[in-house]
Amino acid sequence: MSVANSRIAVYPGTFDPITNGHIDLVNRAAPLFERVVVGVAYSPSKGPALPLERRVELAQEALAAHANVEVRGFDTLLAHFVRDMGAGVLLRGLRAVSDFEYEFQMASMNRHLIPEVETLFLTPAEQYSFISSSLVREIARLGGDVSGFVPASVVDALRQVRESRAQV
């Protein structure tokens, strides 16, 4: 078991896809920590639009400006991933009060599983507070413009998904 280091934070999620809200959170967290690991969860039960490898690539492209940010995919229990990374902080984003109940429950469970790790909540800048990956996927699936919510590489990836499904 690794020793928890409070200068290392893990920011987990499915990032299906990564949004400008996620990027904003990492942009604000990166100066606070020696290292931020963006953990891209496999999450097959969520039926992701993009495969894990592609979600990792898109996150790496979007966050490449940060020398202290690393993007890694994982398919294990989050508590195990956090320990493997040696992190002492688990970062979570709160967009609205509606996120709080779920996030509070998750933080409580994680406190039991990894008591040496603190959960830290960050809120996005106001202009990103309404963006969610699920809304972005739905807008893209229906042919809407998501360019204001995600990086250009994600717009292209979602367009490719839509086109490939249209051919089936």
Curated annotation (Swiss-Prot):
<dbReference type="Pfam" id="PF01467">
    <property type="entry name" value="CTP_transf_like"/>
</dbReference>
<dbReference type="InterPro" id="IPR014729">
    <property type="entry name" value="Rossmann-like_a/b/a_fold"/>
</dbReference>
<keyword id="KW-0548">Nucleotidyltransferase</keyword>
<feature type="site" description="Transition state stabilizer">
    <location>
        <position position="22"/>
    </location>
</feature>
<feature type="binding site">
    <location>
        <position position="22"/>
    </location>
    <ligand>
        <name>ATP</name>
    </ligand>
</feature>
<feature type="binding site">
    <location>
        <position position="78"/>
    </location>
    <ligand>
        <name>substrate</name>
    </ligand>
</feature>
<comment type="pathway">
    <text>Cofactor biosynthesis; coenzyme A biosynthesis; CoA from (R)-pantothenate: step 4/5.</text>
</comment>
<keyword id="KW-0547">Nucleotide-binding</keyword>
<keyword id="KW-0808">Transferase</keyword>
<comment type="function">
    <text>Reversibly transfers an adenylyl group from ATP to 4'-phosphopantetheine, yielding dephospho-CoA (dPCoA) and pyrophosphate.</text>
</comment>
<comment type="similarity">
    <text>Belongs to the bacterial CoaD family.</text>
</comment>
<feature type="binding site">
    <location>
        <position position="46"/>
    </location>
    <ligand>
        <name>substrate</name>
    </ligand>
</feature>
<feature type="binding site">
    <location>
        <position position="14"/>
    </location>
    <ligand>
        <name>substrate</name>
    </ligand>
</feature>
<comment type="subunit">
    <text>Homohexamer.</text>
</comment>
<feature type="binding site">
    <location>
        <position position="103"/>
    </location>
    <ligand>
        <name>ATP</name>
    </ligand>
</feature>
<keyword id="KW-0460">Magnesium</keyword>
<keyword id="KW-0067">ATP-binding</keyword>
<dbReference type="InterPro" id="IPR001980">
    <property type="entry name" value="PPAT"/>
</dbReference>
<dbReference type="InterPro" id="IPR004821">
    <property type="entry name" value="Cyt_trans-like"/>
</dbReference>
<dbReference type="GO" id="GO:0005524">
    <property type="term" value="F:ATP binding"/>
</dbReference>
<feature type="binding site">
    <location>
        <begin position="93"/>
        <end position="95"/>
    </location>
    <ligand>
        <name>ATP</name>
    </ligand>
</feature>
<feature type="binding site">
    <location>
        <begin position="14"/>
        <end position="15"/>
    </location>
    <ligand>
        <name>ATP</name>
    </ligand>
</feature>
<dbReference type="GO" id="GO:0015937">
    <property type="term" value="P:coenzyme A biosynthetic process"/>
</dbReference>
<dbReference type="GO" id="GO:0005737">
    <property type="term" value="C:cytoplasm"/>
</dbReference>
<dbReference type="GO" id="GO:0004595">
    <property type="term" value="F:pantetheine-phosphate adenylyltransferase activity"/>
</dbReference>
<feature type="binding site">
    <location>
        <begin position="128"/>
        <end position="134"/>
    </location>
    <ligand>
        <name>ATP</name>
    </ligand>
</feature>
<feature type="binding site">
    <location>
        <position position="92"/>
    </location>
    <ligand>
        <name>substrate</name>
    </ligand>
</feature>
<keyword id="KW-0963">Cytoplasm</keyword>
<keyword id="KW-0173">Coenzyme A biosynthesis</keyword>
<protein>
    <recommendedName>
        <fullName>Phosphopantetheine adenylyltransferase</fullName>
        <ecNumber>2.7.7.3</ecNumber>
    </recommendedName>
</protein>
